[in-house]
Amino acid sequence: MAQRIFTLILLLCSTSVFAGLFDAPGRSQFVPADQAFAFDFQQNQHDLNLTWQIKDGYYLYRKQIRITPEHAKIADVQLPQGVWHEDEFYGKSEIYRDRLTLPVTINQASAGATLTVTYQGCADAGFCYPPETKTVPLSEVVANNEASQPVSVPQQEQPTAQLPFSALWALLIGIGIAFTPCVLPMYPLISGIVLGGKQRLSTARALLLTFIYVQGMALTYTALGLVVAAAGLQFQAALQHPYVLIGLAIVFTLLAMSMFGLFTLQLPSSLQTRLTLMSNRQQGGSPGGVFIMGAIAGLICSPCTTAPLSAILLYIAQSGNMWLGGGTLYLYALGMGLPLMLITVFGNRLLPKSGPWMEQVKTAFGFVILALPVFLLERVIGDIWGLRLWSALGVAFFGWAFITSLQAKRGWMRVVQIILLAAALVSVRPLQDWAFGETHTAQTQTHLNFTQIKTVDELNQALVEAKGKPVMLDLYADWCVACKEFEKYTFSDPQVQKALADTVLLQANVTANDAQDVALLKHLNVLGLPTILFFDGQGQEHPQARVTGFMDAETFSAHLRDRQP
């Protein structure tokens, strides 16, 4: 008896194992979106928590989460920082795994108010779901002063500003600005004014007065940084809008052009004259007078300092961080003041000779400012085009530096020239791949010629017009990475094209995910993309031939031979 039971158990186990061996390779092993991303919510007066329980092997896109109130007012929602995910077609994206809890503060909600929540995710196996939309009913909430505060994300999840350089770079920029033609020649004169024309001061006294002057200048810059950062904090959400980012990028580009000498950017001459007169009334050689002179000097912007200062101020406004804003401008002023302190203590013998090299320093800072619009535009146009902009900037800078270095006659400059030329050649690679690589691929690959359909009626009409031929329907969307992999790697393969030579090819682009797209996906019982369906000559689908998820050319060719009706 025991032997029979044991034999029966083995038979049942072997049946399930062998059944798995004969499962169709294209059959869906993916769960519905509601199971992949289990959504829930809980409201307690002004506090609303949105929760996603994300199944293992699946993830949500951070940038695809949208929250829209109806008959309600909510505080600005700050999405927690996710983890980075990278693919060939969309580059780096922030995603959420496992679990996501999003607190929302409801300032006011009328009777019948709702919250529309839209989100989208994919599976690691190469399967993406259309955008999901959930409607959250809200309990009536009366506005009060406490609820008007912005929602706070737990501290460990607070997103930090992603900065292209740290505040310490401001110190180096300040030192570099000191060697521009508008600043460096003025240092001996400023040194004499600070010391009050006294030539027999002790080194310690001279250093103290110069340090006080620099601190006065730094105070002005720090105050500017705090004010701009505070203003940026109030308008942080607006400053992240694509149109605002594009506008700021244009402003940064214009500031860079002023460093290239296309036009002069400075305070009005009348205002500069008034500030200069105020500074001249102060008594040089005294700590109080020197401090006021430094504070006023911070407001007098020369053509060489206006553009970099404006660029840093606009950049600080983007961060919205007051500590960063004040610290960055303080270090910038300190960097400008260090050469002045050295000249005051050690004399003009440390001062390099004036010459064309100062104009080259000014031009170099123009390229530094140009890095900021690239950083901003990268958020709008994506990482792929952002890399191309960085490539173009690198080619321009290293190319300019190489041409400039050709004027030098010293032997060791040959090594520098080789390094600059090599850097330019390395920088041009992304542009070369874009200009020649993709074009070459497009010329050598012949893609399938699909007939586009949009609605269920158009699909039915196309099946009738097939006149007995087998039909393949490809469901495609721009947000589907695996769909693009099908186009690039599978549909371009000659063996696949040969196998589909006698097949009517249809394609439905459901990128918009509008009502017609949703109706088509529902009619076909499709969970997500990529999904490829096969119909026989009578317009009946062969469910066993359906493909979900990516297949390479070899696997897809074998699937066509085995499954296509």
UniProtKB/Swiss-Prot annotation:
HAMAP family registered for this protein in UniProt: DbsD
Keywords on record: Cell inner membrane, Cell membrane, Cytochrome c-type biogenesis, Disulfide bond, Electron transport, Membrane, NAD, Oxidoreductase, Redox-active center, Signal, Transmembrane, Transmembrane helix, Transport
Compartmental location: Cell inner membrane
Name of this chain's protein: Thiol:disulfide interchange protein DsbD
Disulfide bridges in this chain: 122-128, 182-304, 480-483
Residue ranges occupied by any Thioredoxin domain in the UniProt entry: 434-565
EC number(s) given by UniProt: 1.8.1.8
UniProt membrane topology term: Multi-pass membrane protein
Transmembrane segments: 163-183, 208-228, 243-263, 289-309, 323-343, 357-377, 384-404
Highest taxon above the source species: Bacteria
Family: Belongs to the thioredoxin family. DsbD subfamily.
The organism of origin for this protein: Escherichia coli O6:K15:H31 (strain 536 / UPEC)
GO molecular function, one term: protein-disulfide reductase [NAD(P)H] activity
